[in-house]
Structures are given as C-alpha cells and as structure tokens.
Amino acid sequence: MSNWQQAAAEITNALPHRIHEVVMVDQSPLARTPRSTPILYLGLYDRVRELFAGRPEALSQGLTASAFSFNSGSGRCERCSGTGFEKIEMQFLSDLYVRCAECEGKRFQPHVLKIKLHGKSIHDLLELTVHEAIEFFAEIGELKTLSEPLDILDEVGLGYLRLGQPLNTLSGGESQRLKLVRHLSETGNRS
C-alpha cells in the first residue's frame, strides 16, 4: 500500500460519517497539445456545438455541430487547423507561436463566426471566462447542463479561466483543480 493510499484509508476510517471518498489528484499536465480546453475536458463542448447548430441561421446553411468544432470539421480555419495560431520552429530556440493571419486567432471560418447564440459567436463564447459563462448559460436556459458543472470550477477558484484556453497553458495547481472538478462533476458529489 502506498503512502497516499494509507493516508486515505486513515482519513476515511477516522471520519467515516463525514468522508465517503478520498481521491488522489496529481499535478501532472492534462494535455501537451493546445487543442484541449477546459470546456472540452469537462465534456461540455458537445452541448455548446449542438446549441449553435440548432440556430436558424446554421440550419439554413446546412451547418451541423461538427462545423463548430475547432479540432475537426468543415468550419475550422484551414490555415491553422483550428488552433488560432501558427507554429514557427526556431532551430535552437523554443518554438514561436503567432496569431493566425487568416482567422486572426478566432479558430473558425467567417461563415461559422456569423452564427450567433444570443449575440455571441462560437469564438466569443470560447473567450468567456468560466464566471462569465456561468451567467451566460443560466440566462439562455442551460443552467443544469452547462452552468452547474462550470459552477464547480468557479467554486475551486478557477472562475478566471477562459473556456477555450489551451490546457497546456495551465499551471500544475490549476491542472490539479480541473481534474478534481471533473471527478466531482462525474460523480455528482460536491461536498
């Protein structure tokens, strides 16, 4: 039995009526790629894409939820492949990342960016902080499916993260808290 397993067993044995589970969460990075984001990691992006694809303007253009994916699909910027930046390899130095000249860092093609969900494009939505997104989703009637899971992020002090922020930019502590939030939202346990 490892030290952390022994410590967890001691804690749950000492307070069995108050502690139901102990979870080990390390500080290892969540992703090494800029393609993963908090909204993707928490499994909330599919619902967001469905909301955009359900807009009358999207339906009239034949846009499906895949058009609102920056990882694949027909709606992402072709030049930067939906990352919003281009990588310049610097032989003996660290790679340099510059904003994509075609999409100007917005990740999507112009026809996709024209689709609005209560006044916000998909890019605008991904730029929202967690705190701002909680309010936005509650206002549009997505309290249960989107606001509540994000509320846990806010409770652990990550309300300042942007929904579309690459996970490889997070610190070890931020990664650790995001892992904890994912566990709590999957188990439905917030206490």
Give the predicted meaning of each segment.
Residues 1-191:
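Conserved phosphate-binding elements of NTP-dependent enzyme cores
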